Amino acid sequence: MALKLDVKAPGGKVEGSIELPAELFDAPANIALMHQVVTAQRAAARQGTHSTKTRGDVSGGGRKPYRQKGTGRARQGSTRAPQFTGGGVVHGPKPRDYSQRTPKKMIAAALRGALSDRARNGRIHAITELVSGQTPSTKSAKAFLGTLTERKQVLVVIGRSDEAGAKSVRNLPGVHILAPDQLNTYDVLRADDVVFSVEALRAYIAANTGTPEEVSA
């Protein structure tokens, strides 16, 4: 069953409504799938540049520290062996790629499940724009978002061309900005509420269904 959202303007006035396709916003939420996709996404974000030196990489230690026999001590061949201070590291981390291959269909299904969960709980909102006009205003944007939700973590999805909106909320704590083609399961689940501009919402729907939704008065 398709859901309908009221579209609100910065002044708080309802400017119409927009329909959310059930295939995108009323899909079953597969927790195991979302967990797998989020784990893969966070793993891919790791730099993987950590590195340690083995005894073969550490400089020095080419000479035998003392003779083999007659000292009463354990025999040693190099001061760069791992048991010595300044020696090499045993089984230490080396640079590696942590990314996992995740099929595109799984990524899309996980995102549908996350958005559907937010939609079913009334945590998706539609707006015409964050601020009126082309002048950024953090104060106005903060007040407007406060009328939509009192929760702390908010994901704002706006078009790439909306520079005034992006500049208005980019310094607000707890607010994260994405373009519609950057939407991902992790950021949706991390946010308490998701706020779409009509432009961004229509772009996301069109990209995933091929049929852009119109705003009705």
Swiss-Prot record:
| SUPFAM superfamilies hit by this protein | Ribosomal protein L4
Q: Name one GO cellular component term.
A: ribonucleoprotein complex
Q: Mind listing the GO biological process terms from this record? A: translation
Give the keywords, sorted.
Ribonucleoprotein, Ribosomal protein, RNA-binding, rRNA-binding
Q: Name one GO molecular function term.
A: structural constituent of ribosome
Q: Where in this protein does the record put region Disordered?
A: 42-100
Oxidoreductase as a keyword? no
S-S pairs: none
The entry assigns this protein to a family as follows: Belongs to the universal ribosomal protein uL4 family.
Q: Which NCBIfam families match?
A: rplD_bact
* Its job: One of the primary rRNA binding proteins, this protein initially binds near the 5'-end of the 23S rRNA. It is important during the early stages of 50S assembly. It makes multiple contacts with different domains of the 23S rRNA in the assembled 50S subunit and ribosome.
Describe the subunit structure: Part of the 50S ribosomal subunit.
Name of the protein in its database record: Large ribosomal subunit protein uL4
Could you tell me which species this protein originates from? Answer: Mycobacterium avium (strain 104)
